[in-house]
Structures are given as C-alpha cells and as structure tokens.
Amino acid sequence: MADCAACHTGAGGTLSGGRAFKSPFGTIYATNITPDKTKGVGDYTDDEWVSALREGVGRGGKHLYPAMPYTSYTQMTREDALAIKAYVMTLPASSDAPPPNDLRFPFSIRFLMVFWNFLYNPDHRFAPDTTHDAAWNRGAYLAEALGHCQQCHTPRNFLQGLKTGQAYAGALQQGWMAYNITSDGPTGIGSWSEADVAAYLRTGHAEGHGAASGPMAEAVSYSLRYLTEADAQALARYVKSIQPIRTTVLPAPTHVAEDELGARIFEGACASCHRANGTGAQSAAAALAGDYTAADPDATNLVQIVVNGGKLQTQDGALVMPGFGDGYTDTELAAVANYTVEHFGQRAGHASPGLVAKARGSATPKVEQPGA
C-alpha cells in the first residue's frame, strides 16, 4: 500500500533506484532501498529507517527531498514502518547506484530542508476521528498515511508544499493530470459510487468512468491491486467523504465538428481495440465511451497515453496500450486526440502539436511492471 516499488524500481530490479523525477528545481533520482549494505539500506537500524520514513531524515542526519512522500508517511505507525522494513530486507540486494541529483542552487543544499520541514512536515501520527466508525478511520489512514494520495492529487505551492486547503482537488504531476477526487459532482467523483471507487482501486477500471493510466496505473499495478476487499471498501468510503471542491467544469456535451485527419487515424490505428463506438473490443478497460480522460478537452492525459502508451497490471493479467509516438507526427497525434475528445466526449479538443511534443519530452524510461 505504501507503493515503494512504483518509484524506487529501476533497471537493476525491484527497489534498486535510479528513476528520475523532474521538479521545478531540477531532477531527483530515486534511491536504492534494497538490502545491499553499501548502496542500499541493508544496515539501517530500526530508528534510522523510521526517521527516514516519518521525518525525512536519513542516516547521519541527511535530509531527504520531499519527492519521497514522508510528509504523508509521518502519519504511519512505527509498527507499519518496521513491517515495511522487514519485507524490504527479504528482497534481493542490488549494488546499483543512482545518478546524483541534479538540482539548482540553492535547492541542492540539503540542510535547507530543515526550514521546509518546519513549514510543511507536521511530524505527527494518525489520530482516529471518533465521530466516524472504524472502517472510515481505516480508509483515512490508508489514504492519508500509507497510500499518500495527497502527494499526487493535491496541488502544490511555489515551494512544492501541499496546498492543504485544496486537498484532493487535482494537480499536474510529471506531465500527467491527477484528477480531482473530492466528492464534487461535476469536477470530482461525486457521481461515483463507493463500489465504483473500490473497483477502480483494485482493478484499475470502473465501468462508465474509465481506466487508470500513467502514475495511477503504476499505483494499481504495484500496490492497490493487492488491497483486501475490506480495505478497498474502507478507502472508497473515506475518499467519497472528502469535502467537495469545485475546479474547472467541463463544457456541456454538444455537437462539435470532428477532426477529419484524426478520424482517419483513429479508424486505422485505434478502432480495432477501442471500436468505432468506443465500447472496447477485448476488455472493458478499453472502452472510451464515458471515460473522463477521453472527454477532457485539455487532453493532457490522453496525449500522454497516445504518445507513450501504458500498461496496467491486474490480478487477471496485463492490459497494454501501445504508444504511437514513433509512428506519427505531432500534428497527427494531436488530431487523433482531438477527434477522440470530440467523438466520445462531444466537446472541442484542445490538443496541440506543442502538447504532443511536450509529452514526447516528458517520457521516462520504461521499467517492467510486476507480473500477475
């Protein structure tokens, strides 16, 4: 549930590190957290491990950067933190060393994190809300601590601190839009049932709402698909209780002119899997009708998927969407993205060749996801 593998898995294997994360201040590389005693965390004491997870301070007082979600893990119990450590120590060790971080001055000075932590890391444990029952509190703990959901779904300020007053209202992360998951109807998941949310978490798909892609697909593949039914229901219950925050409302569906170039490309490259009517040929996850991403005029996530593809690993096997970045021009891919929004969302798409070019540039090296 803590989803360590999604960030720390690299070319050297599970938790070997090396994955790059771009920030406004430069690039941060995930560390090796395998049991290797030289390059990894094999000789960390329990106290050092817990300090790193909950306080963002590693061995020798070395401050971590908040690409590591310790501002959420700070709510984790010591028992859960040490359970993660016990599991990590059973995995194969790797001697891989990630590249050094490439951060601009003065952000390269780790000591400055003392002041950042003073502002943005509360360093407190999860406290149950006695006005709610045990299931709701279990869901709150999973979302706020272990699952660190706010780290992607809450917008950040200019110092990259979470804007807690806009919790779960959606944010752009690594070139992908983490959508509004508050209970707002038009712009959040107010129309989703708790069963829809639970199914989405465990399978990466909710009928009539769409399939997970990008970082959310990784979260499902590496972590959320292993949720027990009870935990998925608890998490869904908590998420559905989040106070609504209204963000940008999608335009009302209307008849719009469809991109002719995009229509031709869709027929030749997309319809065999997604079908012309968007119902999906081989899997419900391939359905475009009703999919929020396919109806979003900004087309941020849609363009990422079209250019770079994606993979969703479920308990029943892998669902793979190939990327088309190598076979089509920026203009052609923008056209097919706009056609998709226009045809299935009945809204004018705003994908541009520039957005496609940006998606090409944001692609990260593919790391093989776990098997079923």
Descriptions of predicted regions:
Residues 4, 149, 270:
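Short cysteine-rich clusters marking metal-coordination/redox-active sites
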Residues 41-57, 61, 83, 190-194:
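Aromatic- and charge-enriched surface segment that lines or borders ligand/interaction sites
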Residues 28-35, 176-182:
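Acidic/histidine-rich, surface-exposed loop or edge segments in extracytoplasmic proteins
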Residues 201, 205, 289-332:
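Extended, polar beta-sheet/loop recognition surfaces of beta-rich domains
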Residues 10-27, 59-140, 144-145, 154-176, ...:
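Flexible coil segments in periplasmic/lumen-exposed cytochrome c-class electron-transfer proteins
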Residues 37-39, 72, 183-187, 221-224, ...:
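Short, recurring structural edge motifs at helix starts
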Residues 261-300, 304:
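C-terminal structural cap/anchor segments
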Residues 1-9:
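Mature N-terminal segment immediately following signal peptide/propeptide cleavage
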